[in-house]
Amino acid sequence: VFFDYDDDNLREDALSDLLAISKLMKENSRYTLLVEGHADERGTREYNLALSERRARAVEDFLVASGVSSFNIEVVGYGEEKPVDLNSNEAAWSKNRRAELYFIK
């Protein structure tokens, strides 16, 4: 799930994927979903940690509103610590402003 610069609102292009994940979670309630929030390198470390957690919480809030139990969701914010693209340009930053979702037992 990707986010706009300095924003924790879900984008329209993420909603269908999140609805599909919601459906899977409701059908497989024995699993836990780990939601990892991330930010690009711009901003202070503290700000980016808070922003990345808000992004992860936005995903969690959407899934809970669609019927997934909050008991089955864990969230963590990593700030800028785990970039997928190490370059310092808009193309890289847009890839790093994200939330990643993992199914765990």
Predicted segments — roles?
Residues 36-105:
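Periplasmic OmpA-like peptidoglycan-binding domain that tethers envelope proteins to the cell wall
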Residues 2-36, 57-70, 101-105:
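Periplasmic peptidoglycan-binding/anchoring modules of Gram-negative envelope and division proteins
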